[in-house]
Swiss-Prot record:
InterPro entries: Amidohydrolase, Bact_exopeptidase_dim_dom, ILR1-like_Hyd, Peptidase_M20, Peptidase_M20_dimer
Protein keywords: Cobalt, Hydrolase, Manganese, Metal-binding, Signal
Residues at which Mn(2+) 1 binds: C138, E174, H401
Cleaved signal peptide residues: 1-23
A GO-annotated cellular component: endoplasmic reticulum
GN (gene name): ILR1
Protein name: IAA-amino acid hydrolase ILR1
GO MF annotation: an example: IAA-Leu conjugate hydrolase activity
Family: Belongs to the peptidase M20 family.
Tissue-by-tissue expression: Expressed in leaves, stems, siliques, seeds and flowers. Detected in central regions of cotyledons, hypocotyl, radicle of mature embryos and seedlings, micropyle of siliques and in pollen.
């Protein structure tokens, strides 16, 4: 899609945004456009943009993996201090929750994850990762920079906030269920809704996408250890071969999706690794394999989990072995399906279209990817939107989790403005409703 001329030129500065005058004044029409485009205009100011880009690059150069985001968290707190924004730290070890507004209901959350991946960056550029074997290959550095940008926009216009905005800087998204850990803290008990924005490399830079209802799969991880009896390879009759048993189980697990699930219901069972002995002429004592399973329904996820255990144990038994099946139960073993609240989605879509035009809003397809942001759906209304960062001229378009992943930083202002405009307009609409509820109770 050609994005030339897709952004509107704004001549009214951010500081002259019109005050809220009546309930729902930002719900649609010129009021919402003025808010959304004004936020974007301010975020695209050269000084503002360079500030955000500098934050993003500092984080990118110093990536930290799950629950080790100490420098990243310190940077977040330093920036919040400079903005005069209050916060709580630590939340879930390295997380930060900040707030702007009246400290009263309603409360709307904005979330950014902070952790990097254990991956060697292969992109050669001036802000390449300085940490060997670690890289921000999922855009979380960008998420943090955009949320800090939103904090600056909101702090400048906090007189517009009819309630409270909570800024959630979350650790440990990549396999650590950091969202689940953060939700244990009472500071997030009062959320009335929450938004997360994730960069996406197949949408043109600056475009926004989402969908109502189911958007991402529920997911789980599993490991299976098959215990047998080892022997010399020349005397297999003295063994209980765990490699053979594990191999049979891996093949049998693929029949869950092909023969046990409704063909109209999506599901995935993928074995990502298998390991056994280390010698060519020895049958080992044990073998191990592991992988992930996905479904677009929570019931489907539970069914697949149960069948992984049953099939693995049964196949091991056929070969006189025993299978030990583990679903990482020390932490949440299942990430729930990510379902966008339809009302929150519709509101976010209106904000996005008011900001960048209807032609630049994309219907995001359902995918089998997983996101621990889905834990927030069990707490409150939640919606995830994606922000395009694709720019083939820059080489930005490689998949998430690729060592060649690269971001077009020109999208930063759009993400910051989307966060801020969404929060202000949502609270404006629901703040008046909350006031009416309080009056009726009195």
């Amino acid at each position: 899609m050609d994005f030339s001329g897709s952004f509107f030129v704004i001549f009214v500065t951010f500081f002259f945004l019109p005050p809220l005058s009546s309930a729902g004044s930002y719900d649609s029409g010129s009021g919402l456009e003025s808010l959304a485009r004004g936020m974007l205009h301010s975020a695209k100011d050269p000084e503002f943009f360079e500030w955000m880009r500098g934050i993003r690059r500092k984080i990118h150069e110093n990536p930290e993996t799950g629950f080790q985001e100490f420098k990243t968290s310190q940077l977040v707190r330093d920036e919040l201090d400079s903005l005069g924004v209050k916060y709580k730290y630590p939340v879930a070890k390295t997380g930060v929750v900040a707030w702007i507004g009246s400290c009263s209901k309603p409360v709307f959350g904005l979330r950014a994850d902070m952790d990097a991946l254990p991956l060697q960056e292969l992109v050669e550029w001036e802000s390449k990762s300085k940490v060997d074997g670690k890289m921000h290959a999922c855009g979380h550095d960008t998420h943090v920079a955009m949320l800090l940008g939103a904090a600056k926009l909101l702090q400048t216009t906090k007189h517009l906030i009819k309630g409270t905005v909570k800024l959630v800087f979350q650790p440990g998204e990549e396999g650590y269920a950091g969202a689940y850990e953060m939700l244990k803290d009472e500071i997030l008990d009062d959320l009335d809704g929450i938004l997360s924005v994730h960069v996406f490399p197949s949408i043109p830079s600056g475009g926004i996408g989402s969908r109502p209802g189911t958007v991402l799969a529920g997911a789980g991880l599993f490991t299976v250890t098959v215990h047998g009896q080892g022997s010399h390879a020349a005397t297999p009759h003295f063994s209980k071969d765990p490699v053979l048993a594990a191999s049979s189980a891996v093949v049998a697990l693929q029949q869950i999706v092909s023969r046990e699930l409704d063909p109209l219901e999506a599901g995935v069972v993928t074995v990502g690794y298998i390991e056994g002995g280390h010698a060519q002429n020895v049958i080992p004592q044990s073998a191990k394999f592991g992988g992930t399973f996905r479904s677009l329904s929570n019931d489907g996820l539970l069914f697949i989990q149960r069948r992984i255990k049953e099939i693995s144990e049964a196949q091991a038994s056929v070969y006189r072995c025993k299978a030990e099946v583990n679903f990482e139960e020390k932490k949440p073993s299942l990430h729930p399906v990510m379902n966008n609240d339809e009302g929150l989605y519709e509101h976010g879509k209106k904000v996005a279209e008011a900001m960048i035009g209807k032609n630049n809003f994309h219907d995001f397809p359902v995918t089998m990817g997983g996101e621990d942001f889905s834990f927030f759906t069990q707490k409150t209304k939640a919606a995830i939107f994606v922000l395009g960062v694709k720019n083939e001229t820059l080489g930005a378009g490689k998949p998430l989790h690729s060592p060649y992943f690269f971001v077009d930083e020109e999208a930063l202002p759009v993400g910051a403005a989307l966060h801020a405009a969404m929060a202000v307009s949502y609270l404006d609409e629901h703040g008046h409703s909350h006031e009416e509820e309080v009056k009726s109770e009195l």
